């Protein structure tokens, strides 16, 4: 029974593959592709710029700078304490 189902499916798939791409799926000419590259790059640049500006605004409005400042202060304090301990230990 499986062979009776597998053979027609195989024939249909093989026919579809050998038929090739439909005219609407055919690859466009390379010259038209090259002509569209500057427009695509400009669109990509604009999209990237908009997303970067939105991300920067989100960071500015969030509390990340305050947390970063606290973390930096903690590291500075810990480093200076460690430095003093090493100075007293090896003096």
Curated annotation (Swiss-Prot):
InterPro entries (alphabetical): ApoC-1_sf, ApoC-I
Q: Does the keyword Ligase apply?
A: no
Report keywords, A-Z.
Answer: Lipid transport, Secreted, Signal, Transport, VLDL
Give its localization.
Secreted
Q: What is its main location?
A: secreted
Q: Which first-to-last residue range defines the signal peptide?
A: 1-26
Instruction: Give Gene Ontology CC terms.
Output: high-density lipoprotein particle; very-low-density lipoprotein particle
Intrachain S-S bonds: none
Please, one GO biological process term?
Answer: very-low-density lipoprotein particle clearance
At the top level, the lineage of the source is Eukaryota
Name one molecular function that GO assigns to this entry: phospholipase inhibitor activity
- Under what name is this protein listed? Apolipoprotein C-I
Q: Which organism is it from?
A: Neovison vison
């Amino acid at each position: 029974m499986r062979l009776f189902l597998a053979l027609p499916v195989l024939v249909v798939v093989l026919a579809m593959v050998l038929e090739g791409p439909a005219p609407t799926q055919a690859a466009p000419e390379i010259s038209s592709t090259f002509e569209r590259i500057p427009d695509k790059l400009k669109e990509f640049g604009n999209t990237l710029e908009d997303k970067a500006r939105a991300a920067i605004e989100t960071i500015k409005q969030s509390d990340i700078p305050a947390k970063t400042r606290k973390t930096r202060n903690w590291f500075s304090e810990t480093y200076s304490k460690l430095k003093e301990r090493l100075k007293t230990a090896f003096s």
